[in-house]
Amino acid sequence: MVGAFHQPKLVYMNMSVLKSLSKRLFNSGFGEIIKHGLIKDKEYYNWLKDNAESIKALDTDALEHMIYVSCNIKREVVENDPKEKGERALLNFGHTLGHAIEKEMNSSLYHGECVVLGMIAALNICVELGTITGEERDDALNTFALYEFPDHVTGIKIDDVVACLLYTSPSPRDLSTSR
């Protein structure tokens, strides 16, 4: 069924898998989790901030709630836009630049760390464009820090990242929501 779209009937998460991860790899997963709160659910985003210590301590109730809400956010977005013609593009927040950074760093940073760096760049651009305030950006930066994400990267050249972006980024037509 190549090219077919089917929504899952069930999402199963074995909590013991999370508890087997290294701290850095576990924290890396929060790039996607925090993104869900930022793009769709302020109450959930605030819950992630308020419960960071319980989550990082692998509290089962906190982890179950976090996974449940994040899966539902992603499910809702994908169901509302199965062919990625509008709202689903929100799930790509931080990913375009994040993937370029990931490639240029030869995967020495985890995917979630690179996505957060991409979100940080996007948030900085949003401040410059006036679509969010500096305080909103700083709040997100503080949340990323709660989950121990890097806030900058060294050892790569901006020209190489830009070249990677130009090679891998969607065309302007792909970015349009009016197809």
Regions found by a protein language model. Give the residues of each.
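Hydrophobic aliphatic residue packing
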Residues: 2, 11, 34, 67, ...
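A glycine/threonine-rich phosphate-anchoring loop and its flanking beta-alpha core
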Residues: 1-53
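Acidic, His/Gly-rich catalytic cores of divalent-metal-dependent hydrolytic chemistry
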Residues: 162-166
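Conserved small/polar residues in nucleotide/adenosyl-binding loops
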Residues: 167-174
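Active-site segments that bind and position negatively charged phosphate/pyrophosphate groups
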Residues: 46, 50-159
